[in-house]
Amino acid sequence: MALTSPVLGQDQLLGWAVKWAIAPYNINYRDFPTQMNTAGAHYTLNGWNTFAKSFITQGNLAKLRDAKLLCYAQPTRAATVRAETVVQRHSRYVIQFPFIQTCENVNQQNTQMLMATVTIDRVEDLDHPDGLAIEQLVVSSGRE
């Protein structure tokens, strides 16, 4: 199959994007290594390394462990395709959606509104049997 051919319909693509973009935000202090590995399997090596570096540099990992947090995320509106291009004979999609993340422990609860911009590449790689991989995830503070 050509790497410019869709591997999923648009609804399935948007669902895939939301599921794997917010997966690293649905974590807890005890199971985060397994949860992060599962999420990372749906990213390119560059995409995951960039995300992980940012996550650690911002202190999110230390905060998760030290405060023994349970974090969960869910979209607050439907995802939309912001761009669809062909880069080096591979389809590339830029998808955006708002989501809310709540982190809590026995003493506190913190909720934040976030905006995810996800760049997804169509790939042909045994490590990505679904034919897609997240090349970049940018999450910023956002309001609806």
Q: What residue spans do the PLM features occupy?
A:
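Structured, amphipathic secondary-structure segments that form assembly/contact surfaces
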Residues: M1-D11, Y25, R30-E144
